[in-house]
Amino acid sequence: MPAMALGLAAGMASCSKSFTDLTPQGTTTDANFWKTESDAIFASNGLYEHFNDDNMFGRGLFWFVNASDDVVTGRTDAGSAAVRNFTATGNESRINSMYKKFYQIIQRANNIIVKVPTMSISDKTKNQVIGEAYFMRGYASFYLSQYYGDQRAGVPIVTEQNMNENKFTRPANIQENFKQIESDLLKAADMLPLLTTYDASNLGRANKDAAYAYLAKTNVQWARYDKSKWAQVVKYCDMVTNSGSGRKLIDTDNPAVDFASVFYVENNYSSEYIFSVVSNKVYGSILPAVMFENTGYGLYNGWGYFHPSLELYNSFEAGDPRRKATILEFGDTFTLFGQERKYFSSNSQTGFQFNKYMQPFRFPKDQHLNPNGDYPTSNLNIPLVRYADILLMKAEALIMDGKNGDAEINKVRNRAGLSNLSGATLTQLKRERRSEFAGEYTDRHSDLVRWGDAQAAYAKPATGRQHTVKTDPNSPYTIITVWAPRNFNPSVHHVWPIPPQDVSNSGIAQNQGW
């Protein structure tokens, strides 16, 4: 395999044969592999190994979300500050590995697409594994395109046709990437089963609805350059809704609980689930603990990153229960390891903490949390796409096409106990997305960029509450500037810098202005 900055790892990823236990277990080679159904399944499991990588959906990609006006860094260092301030070089340890890791996923998918069709295994397994490979290639390419590509240059397209080339070039524009992503995800949708057909040990694998969902997400981004793609967003959102898997919001007419319960361990695979980072007590995303109080009041090793801003807190509509489900403020009552207490923080820069992923912390520590506080995973899956996003993407597409998106947006609002909108506007849609997806990988920053709102939003300071006694839940506060206004140049900062080592090794051009 050629050595190149795209990080296309030659060796098969080594992992357990169980989808839910992807602990590395040595290496394999072509000489002793690609023989049996177990080999094919083993290879497909390697597509998900990045779920256990802090540099991906632990903290890594959240540094991009953290650039938004919803979040303030917490425990700031020079590298994280550079990312948030749009002065990064791409060398920063916070963000210098995601680019190559997404290409590693693509290479693993390419290996499957090349090798599995000729294996003497059942058609069912063959279709499943190849379908997962097409999905994960499209999924990885989606994130690469969203973060690194634009109309001036796409990101290198690597498929089974050119995977062994020594050099790659950047396509003329990102629309070339979108075409490849769409092709891959359509193949995946054709080959993959509905998620409801999986047994418990395989829940979390790529599925038909996830392929349609990422097709919708791809076309939302594509519509920035081609307005006709809004109709495709509606089409693919409807394909999720009508697939037969029963995707719907968790809505029991109990607004105080329903939204919060989306992020309960027992609802990892609820009717709202489409695709998530699979996690358990020894494997998966550490994001919940990353957001928890630094050192966790001496009870558990929280890391104290990513604090909600006062701007996010104030953005919620009056009476919206999603604010309480999303944010802890001083004096709020919450349960920690079986004991009720009132929230305070010696760590928070803003006086707030994300509450969205705190359910695993309600119980005795050994029930849902990794005993290893140095890699504090939990049993809570972290959503990448959920059904509320399908509804709000469709609503946005309809509004952008001059049509009415009230039905979809009001389903989301009604679940929160809020009144119906009539003739919902794009401004109202934007607020709804902010309230629904705060602190998630759905990514407020990417929304602001594609809407053209980032420059104005980031020209304002991020503020918070400075409490006079940080250990007193009832302490009074003053409003302070936590992060100064930032200079966001929409002709440069709409994408991120490709890590310079990858640029140097591959010979591709860096994104303009970085």
Each predicted region: which residue ranges?
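An aromatic- and glycine-enriched ligand-binding surface/loop that stacks and positions planar moieties
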Residues: 16-79, 153-155, 178, 186-187, ...
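Flexible, polar/acidic helix-loop-strand segments at domain edges
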Residues: 317-386
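Long, intrinsically disordered, low-complexity segments
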Residues: 14-16, 72, 102-105, 180, ...
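Short coil/linker segments at helix-helix boundaries
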Residues: 148-175, 227-231
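Conserved, well-structured interaction surfaces
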Residues: 37-45, 49-52, 76-148, 168-177, ...
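Bacterial Sec-dependent N-terminal signal peptides
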Residues: 1-24, 446
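A glycine-rich, coil/turn loop motif that links secondary-structure elements
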Residues: 125-131, 198-211, 422
